[in-house]
Structure formats: C-alpha cells, structure tokens
Amino acid sequence: MISSRSISLATLLASLLLPMLASATSPSPPAVAHPEFYPSPDPVLKTMPFSEAVRAGDFLIVSGQIGSLPDKMALAPGGITGQSRQAIENVASVLRRHGATLRDVVECTVFLADMKDWPAFNTVYKEYFKPPFPARSATGASGIALGARVELQCTAYVPATAK
C-alpha cells in the first residue's frame, strides 16, 4: 500500500524535476545579436559623430539624409524638388551599400524646413515609393543641416538571411 507520505514525496520530486527536464529538451532561445554600426564611406561624413546606418536584427536604420550632392557638402539645385529627389537618392545609396533597396523601406520620417513644401515633397516621394507606402511621419523643422529644405530618415526591413 502506498502511503500519503510517498505520494507527497513523489509529487515534490516531480514538481522539481519536470521543469528541469522540460528545459533540457527545449531549444535554447536564439542569441541576441548586437547592433552593427556602419560609418559613411564619405571622408567628410566619416568624421561626423553618427553612423550612416545601423543594423538592429532584421532592420536597417538609415540616418537622416539631406539633399546634398554625393562627395560634396553642397545642396542639390532646384529647391525643394531637387533636394527631395537627392535626399531620396542618398537614402537609396546607403541602402544599396548595405544590401537593401527602397522597396525594403517600412518607415520614413520627413523633416521639412517649411511645411508649405509638403505637397512638392510628396510629388517627388511618389516617384520613388509606390503603394503600399511605408509608414511615414512629416514634421516641420528649423535648422536642418547646411540650410537644407528637407531631411529624410528611413528604416528598412532586411532579414539577416537576405543580407
């Protein structure tokens, strides 16, 4: 005959051993990858205190891009239209360097020196981004670098296996 003391001891042992056995057969959680920071290849930008992009897991975060001409500290001509086009081209260049395209972009934040430029920016934006559009915010901002009329920061979804 089994005593109540034997049942209590068996219950205690089971409650202690079962969680250990379950964890021994369960796969361990994947290691958390640390962010990767990518400096700009541009000699001038390389000296600035920011990365051109950061990979965090499956996301590639592109630092704000203004409409500056490649390898120059000068803005593209053509006002908001020319600067918007160049800013998006600059985002596309950073994405390409890190294995992504504008089609991978899932979020953009737009900083406009004058919110009256929003319609003109949207016209250019729609030349590059097609439905379904990335999530997006736009805000008025004063003091954009180099006196730019627009700055664009984007995040792309690029699974590490596709990198």
Where are the predicted features?
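N-terminal secretory signal peptides that target proteins for export/translocation
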Residues: 1-4
